[in-house]
Regions:
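Short, C-terminally biased terminal segments at protein or domain edges
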Residues: 1-132
Length: 132
């Protein structure tokens, strides 16, 4: 089985992941702008959250062009790490009461679902690699 076939299988299992991570990146940019406007600690957190939140989808796009199964898995793992980092920043924003802390609940739910999907993709890809 080639890497391209593996990618198609993952997409067939979760066809919405690229669209969801793109929408999440768009919401990340919106929250980044709100955090920067708020100033203070929010100003400092904003760039780190922006980097993590926008790189999830970018790394999935790179995974799509992976040259091997191992390359595909590595890139999806990077996307997973970035999703976990974005989740950390969202949790911090929420519990610290940084503006707009009330707006992050939906984003936190979405990133939790993205993490779960990416874990499934990585597990299936690794299983496929081991079973060939």
């Amino acid at each position: 089985m080639t890497a391209r076939i593996l990618i198609v299988q993952c997409r067939m299992d979760h066809p919405e992941i690229n669209a969801r991570t793109f929408r999440f990146a768009c919401r990340t940019v919106e929250l980044y702008r709100a955090l920067r406007r708020a100033g203070g600690a929010a100003w400092e957190i904003a760039p780190q959250f922006l980097d993590a939140g926008t790189s999830i989808g970018a790394n999935l796009e790179e995974a799509t062009g992976g040259q091997s199964k191992r390359d595909f898995i590595a890139k999806v793992c990077i996307a997973l790490k970035q999703a976990r980092e974005a989740r950390f920043w969202l949790r911090l924003i929420r519990v610290s009461g940084l503006p707009p802390s009330k707006a992050v609940a939906a984003d936190l739910q979405e990133v939790n679902e993205i993490v779960a999907i990416l874990i499934t993709i990585v597990r299936r890809a690794k299983d496929s690699l081991e079973n060939r």
